[in-house]
Amino acid sequence: MKNIKGFKVAVALYTVLVTASCSTSPKGDGTLTFVESNENALTVCHFDQVKNTININLSELVEDLKIIRFENTDNAFFKSCNLCITDHYIGIRQSESLPFLLFDHNGKLKCQVGAIGNGPGEYSQTIYDEAINEKTGEIYLSFFFSLPKVLVYNTDGKFVREIVTKEKLSKPKVEVDDNGDITIIHMPFTYNKEKFLATVYNKNGLFKQELKPTPNFLQENFNQDIFAYHNVPEFSFWLSSCDTLFHYDKNANKIYPKFKMDFGKMSETPLHIYNELPGYYLTAMLWDKGIIAVNKEKQTSNYARLINDFFGHMEAPMFNFSNGWFYQMFEPGRLITQIEKRLTDSDCSAEDRKQLETMLESIDEEGNNILFMGKLKQKGK
């Protein structure tokens, strides 16, 4: 989709959702404009206006840094596809043929969640999203395609129940409230009998509500993707066919467009992905073309590099925020390589050097993975 069309779709959809909207003049550093109403504001970042690059310290975004060394028992070794971190747990999504694993913050394997197979509580499809809710003591797994359900387990890995939906789910994203309500957003297809963009079930699996899709959300094939990183209180998501980041308001049963990158009249829109943090909108330009960080409060936009000032001032991945946590997973050999590279930098201070060398000496190259993680600060903290 050409971006100018995507921009028109976003603005057109917004004018349907709200009334008395108006486009404001640029604010902040001039890279942003806003489409505003009494109940919402759509932030538009103009790609051709973003020129500068800044460093952001990790300590500005997270409360502290934890370094987790996962245990070296045979059952605990893994290759991570994705992870879900909470205050006490680390959930590891593996490949299609391997089960979900649950660790504690000491890196100890607590359990395997369910099992691979086709029996009750088993799964053979790729996990597409997961949620761990410590209030309910449950783990929720959703799957890539064609299953009309979300599987629920306890934190001992035992199957508890399934949430059965009205329609087969396609690339579903899930969030669970403290009261156990589960919200599901997925890609609706034109051929679905029961078309919904979002749906909510209570903790017992009883249907509560759904939001029907407008035509621009309906899909003909699997060429698009849906993303949700679960870093803010609202259900923040974006569907690549619309190229706008939305919030789903469960209480109002509405969606609101919140952020859009305007690429102007470029003949080909650069491949990109959106993420949202409490204080930033992030746009990852794929193929190592940088991360654009929009500061919500200052109303500024810059290319951004993330610096891990907790650990040797090593550069860290700016986009690695999910479920309210920063994460950076290393195989031991890769961490050794990055530390050695940092030690050759001319700006590596004596203090940083000591910290890095101490860590380097402690790494078992044949050991399990090592995780750097930190909980996101919430807005105003």
Specify the residue positions occupied by each region the protein language model found.
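C-terminal motif of bacterial Sec signal peptides marking the signal peptidase cleavage site
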Residues: T19-S21
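Short coil/turn segments at the loop-to-beta-strand junctions that recur within blades
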Residues: T73-A76, G114-E122, V164-K171, T214-Q219, ...
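Blade-loop segments of beta-propeller domains
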Residues: E71-S80, P99, F103, K108-T136
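Conserved blade-ending motifs and adjacent loop-strand segments that build the rim/top face
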Residues: Y256-Y274, K298-N323, I336
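Repeated scaffold domains used in trafficking and secretory/extracellular systems
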Residues: F78-N82, S124-E130, K168-D177, L218-F227, ...
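Short beta-strand elements that form the blades of beta-propeller/WD-repeat-like
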Residues: L42-V44, H88-Q94, G137-F144, G180-N192, ...
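Asp-box/WD-like beta-propeller blade repeats and closely related beta-sheet repeat scaffolds
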Residues: S124-I127, F144-E194, L211-T214
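Blade/loop signatures of beta-propeller domains
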Residues: G28-I67
